[in-house]
């Protein structure tokens, strides 16, 4: 018998939750392709090793950008490989799959995700909004008629939402998150230190010494890259410099400020009763970005948000796993409570349900978005 799965199809990583097992796969969203033949050579962590290696015969692709598919063929190959690897298909059955997406996803982007998941082996494929699923994975009761606020900072998008009664009350989706912060670091070091580094090194810097605030005791780190200064008439020679957490905060400041500003706007849009709930319960912070600054005393992104929003901020227990876990949990819940499944998958009122039924059913009668058939 097939096992249902929940997929966090992230810009940086793919996580898959398997029914009865929990998180069974966590791999980089990377595909390595032979330039001459267009053949897929490696996927996931095996492909990630080729980033910045300078091999002209191999093209390294990150098939998702800003939380949505940018290379359909590579995404399809990647998902198919991962699903087959988990052996979730039955002898004569295929799994139900829930995939998560940003709240500002377009109709074309929705269809691409659904089709990729179907090609990977899904029978009924569902799409749900990421902050809603992240909230479930973080342990929040989204069906309670109490206000909850979630900030989910992933690789490609930052999704901010207020939820109550099983629905999203208001939300923002910024195509500005972990990957943008990594690019900010690369750009800053190029301009301020005259050194060129690649994505893997920038990721290490972000994780090890990154800070969301200027701190009294920054952590230092010595890094190596290519010299971009031409004082000796020779560019590209190896170069070593020492940086610290306050340098990295300066590099990331503008992007972090945009996320904070959007969170303030969300809080300004909600009713006083919901605002009171959020003050009492705090904001739940999820996604890989929730760990930013966690190694620097006083530099965590939770501290930044709490300082700027004047609301308690809590980091979920397993922020990297919340979306995949929440997707799997919703599918399992839907199977147990099928009479209430429309609410589970986000159809909160008749007009919204009608709109989804009209706009999002595609190609095959058994492929739907935000819809479980009774």
Regions from the language model: what does each represent?
Residues 1-153, 161-283, 290-374:
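Nucleotide/phosphate-binding catalytic cleft detector across ATP-hydrolyzing
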């Amino acid at each position: 018998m097939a096992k249902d799965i929940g997929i966090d199809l992230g810009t940086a990583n793919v996580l898959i939750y398997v029914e009865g097992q929990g998180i069974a796969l966590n791999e980089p969203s990377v595909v390595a392709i032979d330039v001459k033949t267009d053949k897929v050579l490696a996927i996931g962590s095996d492909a990630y090793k080729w980033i910045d290696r300078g091999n002209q015969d191999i093209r390294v692709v990150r098939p998702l950008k800003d939380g949505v598919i940018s290379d359909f063929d590579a995404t399809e190959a990647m998902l198919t490989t991962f699903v087959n690897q988990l052996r979730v298909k039955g002898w004569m059955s295929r799994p139900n799959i829930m995939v998560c997406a940003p709240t500002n996803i377009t109709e074309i982007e929705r269809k691409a995700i659904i089709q990729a998941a179907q090609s990977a082996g899904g029978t009924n494929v569902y799409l749900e909004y990421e902050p809603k699923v992240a909230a479930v994975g973080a342990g929040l009761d989204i069906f309670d008629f109490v206000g909850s606020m979630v900030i989910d900072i992933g690789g490609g998008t930052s999704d901010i939402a207020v939820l109550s009664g099983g629905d999203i009350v208001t939300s923002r989706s910024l195509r500005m998150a972990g990957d943008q912060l990594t690019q900010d670091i690369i750009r800053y070091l190029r301009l301020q230190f005259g050194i060129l580094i690649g994505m893997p090194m920038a990721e290490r810097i972000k994780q090890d010494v990154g800070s969301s605030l200027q701190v009294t005791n920054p952590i230092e780190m010595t890094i190596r890259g290519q010299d971009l200064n031409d004082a000796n008439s020779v560019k590209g020679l190896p170069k070593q410099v020492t940086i610290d957490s306050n340098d990295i905060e300066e590099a990331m400041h503008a992007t972090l400020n945009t996320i904070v500003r959007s969170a303030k706007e969300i809080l300004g849009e909600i009713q006083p009763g919901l605002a009171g709930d959020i003050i009492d319960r705090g904001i739940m912070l999820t996604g890989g970005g929730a760990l930013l600054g966690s190694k620097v005393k006083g530099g965590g992104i939770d501290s930044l948000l709490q300082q700027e929003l004047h609301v308690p901020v809590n980091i979920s227990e397993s922020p990297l796993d919340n979306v995949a876990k929440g997707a799997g949990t919703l599918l399992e819940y839907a199977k147990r409570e099928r009479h209430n499944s429309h609410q589970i998958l986000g159809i909160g009122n008749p007009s919204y349900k009608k709109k989804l039924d009209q706009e999002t059913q595609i190609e095959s009668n058994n492929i739907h978005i935000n819809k479980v058939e009774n």
